[in-house]
Amino acid sequence: MPGKWISALLLLQISCCFRSVKCGKVLVWPMEFSHWMNIKIILDELVQRGHEVTVLRPSAYYVLDPKKSPGLKFETFPTSVSKDNLENFFIKFVDVWTYEMPRDTCLSYSPLLQNMIDEFSDYFLSLCKDVVSNKELMTKLQESKFDVLLSDPVASCGELIAELLQIPFLYSIRFSPGYQIEKSSGRFLLPPSYVPVILSGLGGQMTFIERIKNMICMLYFDFWFQMFNDKKWDSFYSEYLGRPTTLVETMGQAEMWLIRSNWDLEFPHPTLPNVDYVGGLHCKPAKPLPKDMEEFVQSSGDHGVVVFSLGSMVSNMTEEKANAIAWALAQIPQKVLWKFDGKTPATLGHNTRVYKWLPQNDLLGHPKTKAFVTHGGANGVYEAIYHGIPMIGIPLFGEQHDNIAHMVAKGAAVALNIRTMSKSDVLNALEEVIENPFYKKNAIWLSTIHHDQPMKPLDRAVFWIEFVMRHKRAKHLRPLGHNLTWYQYHSLDVIGFLLSCVATTIVLSVKCLLFIYRFFVKKENKMKNE
């Protein structure tokens, strides 16, 4: 009987594969950390549907572990960048952004951000050179005849590999600083009058002063900030493609952009047909908790529990700050499950248990969970939205400030500043979110609209990948704006022509009037003289 069931399941999988698209070959150029965790969800689903997925893995990557992904194939290639160097860079990157970077305006943090991004760009340029100069690997990839490439544009190079292999490619991205990649390479439409620029930390309904700040941010990211060292990348891409080109032009060839966000987190703005918002694709129903954890949760009674996690990349919280947080947690009647990897705080209460790892999604989906203290990472925020849990946000770096600002604007969170918050601030925020039904009501509303979609985010992401494999491209969805120069795109040539026409008309009209005036004046003077 089991053998029959296995055969039936295999037959069903094969039939599903043929119904949607022939079982294809997908090549992946990934990014590390949460970027990899998100894209891996898509890859696992592709494997479930019968596709063959191969991941290009730089040997310097240390989070992306092939042993934890048995269904995927990996091509690990040697790199000139060491694993220790890359790890130390990312740790420094997070620490500087969390504790040193000014947050007043975009201009206040711009020099520090640009320095970090320049170093980031150099690392990935080295990784890109390592992979495309590896003739043995590139020959193997060429012979494998992949159907499509899936890439994270924050880690540039996927588009170059796709061009060299002559296959279509798609992007999976949460954001780039200031939406620079999205605007320059994707031609995204993001009016600064009502769309907050990412990394501005602004919410949806902006005041006049906030719109000024937003405009300054947009101008900075559009005209001064460089996500990648353009000259280096442009020269490198031109050399390997054998023709003059630019990084922006090459990235602009993407068939589809899969944005790891959605309208329950974002604010409405214009979008394009080759862009789909698939935020929350990793979310799923909660599973049962481990026995000892379930017993602790149940012991909370009617008060319920609070889940506390500031992510996996921050482990250097000061002892003073940890004690302030622990003291505040000890004052509430709820039981607390705290993901914390450090010295146990002296003020830790009897109601609080510290764990090095938490089944976060399963806890957020537990009926006794009352609130979620989070750093505001997109994954955690979406899990809270999925399960309808209000948040206390303590953003640390990246777009976390923006995520929490959006949740505050939507009435599902309260924000704290990790640099300035006191123990009383933490306690007041906890009591406000737990006791005020306003936050729970809005969290449930966000959860409701997240679930009320015609197609699950993960299914949409996979659909578009299979769509590109079926049709070999999706050029009919790609805006023609990609074929225009920057001045044509903004109609500056048309505006200049029309202004010149108006100016010419005005000049000719004035000259005609002057001629007529002089003619009649001369005629009148002549008549008087006679």
From Swiss-Prot:
It is a single-pass membrane protein. The keyword Membrane applies. It catalyses: glucuronate acceptor + UDP-alpha-D-glucuronate = acceptor beta-D-glucuronoside + UDP + H(+); 17alpha-estradiol + UDP-alpha-D-glucuronate = 17alpha-estradiol 3-O-(beta-D-glucuronate) + UDP + H(+); 17alpha-estradiol + UDP-alpha-D-glucuronate = 17alpha-estradiol 17-O-(beta-D-glucuronate) + UDP + H(+); 17beta-estradiol + UDP-alpha-D-glucuronate = 17beta-estradiol 17-O-(beta-D-glucuronate) + UDP + H(+). Residues 1-23 form the signal peptide. GO terms for cellular component: endoplasmic reticulum membrane; mitochondrial inner membrane. Keywords: Endoplasmic reticulum, Glycoprotein, Glycosyltransferase, Lipid metabolism, Membrane, Signal, Steroid metabolism, Transferase, Transmembrane, Transmembrane helix. CDD domains: GT1_Gtf-like. GO terms for biological process: estrogen metabolic process. GO terms for molecular function: glucuronosyltransferase activity. Glycans are attached at N316, N483. It is found in: Endoplasmic reticulum membrane. The chain crosses the membrane at residues 494-510. Pfam families: UDPGT. InterPro entries: UDP-glycosyltransferase, UDP_glucos_trans, UDP_glycos_trans_CS. Its EC number is 2.4.1.17. UDP-glucuronosyltransferase (UGT) that catalyzes phase II biotransformation reactions in which lipophilic substrates are conjugated with glucuronic acid to increase the metabolite's water solubility, thereby facilitating excretion into either the urine or bile. Catalyzes the glucuronidation of endogenous steroid hormones such as androgens (epitestosterone, androsterone) and estrogens (estradiol, epiestradiol). Belongs to the UDP-glycosyltransferase family. This is UDP-glucuronosyltransferase 2B17. It comes from Mus musculus. The lineage of its organism: Eukaryota, Metazoa, Chordata, Craniata, Vertebrata.
